[in-house]
């Protein structure tokens, strides 16, 4: 983040060049406060044309809440690899119900150090935040106990996801 912060302050509206994220060219902000050097996400929003509306309606007419959206690979309780097929309804309800069980609101911040390629990070992390309007905080590229705890403190996170081995590492 310091590298991004430095470039944002010194780069008026042109592509960024970051050593750790060479493919990242633009950073967009969400919210009411403009940030110099960054583009507002609202600038990407367009009024849909009739052609786009028709295209969306065609896709919607062929979708069902019970259609498969994702195959989550797992070893489950047996230890044998398999694909668990999830539907739109599975994933959205899971995110919504867990956000309600956690009593998360737009005032909360959830630290998500778990991998996004797993249901824990993607559904119980991202979708919980989307369903509740809370803020998703990603402490780093991969799990590091010290970085995670520092991020929780600095960002004033009100929730922290993890598995037992992660919490043990944080306690050590």
Region locations from a protein language model:
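Conserved AMP-binding/adenylation subdomain of ANL enzymes
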Residues: 92-109, 119-159, 168
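Conserved structural elements of the adenylate-forming
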Residues: 51-53, 65, 70, 84-105, ...
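Conserved S/T- and glycine-rich ATP-binding loop of Class I adenylate-forming
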Residues: 68, 74-77, 110, 116, ...
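Conserved adenylate-forming
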Residues: 1-43, 140-172
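Proline-centered helix-kink/hinge sites
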Residues: 81-83, 115, 129, 145, ...
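Conserved pre-ATP/AMP-binding loop-to-beta segment of ANL
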Residues: 20-24, 29, 35, 39-73, ...
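Conserved phosphate-binding and hydrolysis motifs of nucleotide-dependent enzymes
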Residues: 75-83, 88, 163
């Amino acid at each position: 983040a310091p590298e991004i912060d430095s470039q944002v302050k010194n780069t008026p509206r042109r592509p960024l060049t970051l050593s750790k994220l060479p493919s990242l060219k633009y950073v967009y902000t969400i919210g009411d406060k403009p940030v110099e050097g960054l583009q507002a996400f609202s600038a990407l929003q367009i009024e849909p044309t009739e052609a786009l509306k028709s295209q969306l309606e065609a896709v919607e007419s062929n979708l069902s809440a019970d259609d498969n959206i994702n195959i989550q690979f797992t070893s489950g309780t047996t230890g044998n690899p398999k694909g668990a097929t999830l539907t739109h309804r599975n994933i959205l309800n899971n995110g919504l119900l867990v956000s309600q069980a956690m009593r998360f609101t737009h005032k909360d911040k959830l630290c998500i150090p778990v991998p996004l390629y797993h249901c824990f990070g993607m559904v119980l992390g991202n979708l919980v935040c989307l369903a509740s309007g809370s803020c998703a905080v990603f402490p780093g590229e991969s799990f590091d106990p010290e970085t995670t705890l520092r991020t929780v403190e600095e960002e004033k996170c009100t929730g922290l996801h993890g598995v037992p081995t992660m919490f043990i590492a944080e306690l050590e």
